[in-house]
């Protein structure tokens, strides 16, 4: 007997994303909204995540980009794929053509555990209306105080920071000014940039602070993550660059 109505089980945790390319091809939107919101939601299932990032949750193994092809979720600095692969080394991705393939098979797939991600839908939530941020809905859920630790620790270890002793915990503050002067776009007028650098270095000389004037486009992705993890105070002319700092373990 041939059965045509049976479902085929996909027995792994799966993310199904409905975002369009314009809302995902930037590190801020992909990591600081989609990934951050996904894990904040998923981690609410385990209120006992430890400081060391140990969780009873199964690691997501699939992400399906329903409306994107393989190139449309990547950002120019290529941080999106770096963070996703470092956070979930075993994750596999499927794209719009794969979604069509599955639909055309004419068979249902039973997902063991699935989380739907839709930025446009989250903007209709009551919490988002209060603060104007799609993440507000996910952040309203209960959860462990260390809910982000599993993601941050995976990414930091991937960047070569083995544990928190590699980060600044004691000692002088680390001030990082992310300069955009050579990149163009949102940047300070030259004289204001020079004055800011001068004043930051005066803090270094007077108080012993570590001061970094960094052009991120000159650093590798690992170097960017390591610098962000060590930074105590970040200074930038463009707020979305601060989203690198979310990979610090303690938020």
Spans of model-derived segments:
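The feature primarily captures lumenal catalytic ectodomains
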Residues: 1-251
């Amino acid at each position: 007997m041939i059965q045509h109505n049976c479902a085929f089980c996909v027995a792994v945790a799966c993310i199904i994303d409905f975002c369009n390319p314009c809302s995902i091809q930037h590190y801020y939107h992909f990591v600081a909204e989609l990934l951050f919101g996904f894990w904040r939601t998923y981690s609410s299932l385990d209120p006992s995540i430890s400081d060391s990032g140990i969780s009873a949750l199964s690691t997501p193994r699939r992400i399906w980009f329903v409306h994107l092809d393989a190139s449309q979720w990547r950002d120019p600095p290529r941080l999106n794929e770096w963070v996703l692969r470092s956070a979930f080394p075993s994750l596999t991705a499927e794209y719009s053509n794969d979604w069509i393939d599955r639909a055309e098979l004419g068979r249902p797939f039973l997902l063991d555990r699935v989380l739907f991600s839709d930025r446009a839908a989250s903007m209709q939530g009551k919490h988002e209306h209060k603060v104007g941020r799609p993440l507000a809905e996910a952040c309203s859920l209960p959860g462990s105080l260390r809910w982000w630790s599993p993601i941050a620790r995976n990414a930091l270890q991937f960047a070569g920071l083995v544990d928190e002793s590699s980060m600044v915990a004691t000692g002088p503050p680390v001030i990082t000014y992310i300069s955009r002067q050579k990149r163009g776009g949102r940047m300070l007028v030259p004289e204001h940039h020079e004055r800011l650098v001068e004043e930051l270095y005066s803090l270094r000389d007077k108080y012993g602070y570590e001061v970094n004037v960094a052009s991120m486009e000159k650093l590798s992705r690992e170097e960017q993550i390591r610098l962000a993890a060590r930074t105590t105070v970040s200074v930038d002319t463009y707020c979305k660059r601060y989203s690198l700092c979310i990979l610090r373990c303690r938020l």
